[in-house]
Amino acid sequence: MINHYFHQLLAITLLVSSTTAIAERGPAIPDYPADRVAENVYVIHGPLGVPSVKNQGFMNNPAFVIGDKGVILIDPGSSVQTGEMVLRQIRKLSELPVVAVFNTHIHGDHWFANQAIHDAYPDVAIYGHEEMRKLVLKGEGQRFFETLMRMTEGAVAGTLEVPPNQSAAHGDELTIAGVTLHILFEPKAHSYSDIMIELPQQRILFLGDNVMSKRLGQMDSGTFNGNIAAIELALESRAEIYIPGHGRTGGREVPETYLDYLSSLKTEVAKHFEEGLSDFEMSPLIVETLSRFSDWVDFERNVGRHISLAYLEVEAELF
């Protein structure tokens, strides 16, 4: 049942900056192809990089599963415009209604498109971890939206905040439209609110931003230890197909490669911390050690910040 307090949230708040008129709306998102990764399972692989004017804020991997009586959608995207594009791709493949949406975590590039799905299917169940729902109530969605508005120069304008109305917790097993889904959760991973969704029958695992491929994102909202633990949990599954939050779908090499990055960075930071180096002093040494990742999108933008955050984490572990 939908929680009573969540009916209050669904008195949907328009997310616009104070300088943006309510009537304004960003342009439509062009169609991106839905790539078949397994029978009845599709991923719309978004462009890599940060939100921008060029990508209109769309840069994640919306995915959907066509069940026997409906469609299940994972992380529909960053705006109402993205959600409308995702629905267009679904309708090219199925006339069934969207009956459930899963949001992997709090970052709005994955869930602000809920609005378009809710507009088309007002009774749709939207799942997220309880920690995500709490963070929405604390205003994390609003803050992320303001960033999207700035970085896209208003391309996401007109988007409404439609948060999850159902909770999904670690170990939950659901059957929706004939599809079995198993929920995995590791606290303090990429964002403190990250669920991963396993399709055990298809041996598929949706990783959310616990894993990225060929792209480095921010780590300000989580921890290295928790993110590493989440990937190790993912690799304990029987999945053969792994779908990251950003980047191309693949096999075990997808989570294993990102695990290599996080583990190597954290290990190097701890080593140089013991040697008495500051984060600034160790940074060029670690960047050289991680040179195998230097062709990843946003490596230069984020690796220094990652080193500083890992330094603080190592320091905190001493107390």
Task: Please give the residue ranges for each predicted region.
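Conserved beta-strand hairpin/beta-sheet module of binuclear metal-dependent hydrolase folds
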Residues: 39-92, 195-207
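Active-site HxH/HxHxD metal-binding segment of metal-dependent hydrolases
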Residues: 88-166, 170-173
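Bacterial N-terminal signal peptides that target proteins for export
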Residues: 1-9
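N-terminal signal peptide c-region/cleavage motif recognized by signal peptidases
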Residues: 17-19
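Cleaved targeting-peptide boundary
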Residues: 22-29
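Metallo-beta-lactamase
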Residues: 70-72, 78-80, 173, 180-264, ...
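Divalent metal-coordination and catalytic microenvironments
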Residues: 40, 65, 75, 90, ...
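Accessory terminal helices/loops
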Residues: 24, 236-238, 249-319
